[in-house]
Amino acid sequence: MEQQTNNPLHGKRIEQILKELVAYYGWEHLGHKIQIGCFRNNPSIGSSLTFLRRTNWAKSEVEALYIEMYRKEQAVKNTN
């Protein structure tokens, strides 16, 4: 199997990605960054996962935001 050391999504499930984004941004800020109803109205991991698994464009936006967050965290680690 090919190693993907530079891919922050490799080996991550959408549930883990979502939980990390919620921990980093919080639901309110996440709802502003990605304007999806399940992030803004009574947000929960369960309802968000159901929506993301059925809606490819939304899942792509969540993955892109995760990569952005990951790169910011790596930049901070590299400056310290």
Regions found by a protein language model. Give the residues of each.
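Long, compositionally biased intrinsically disordered regulatory segments in eukaryotic proteins
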Residues: 1-80
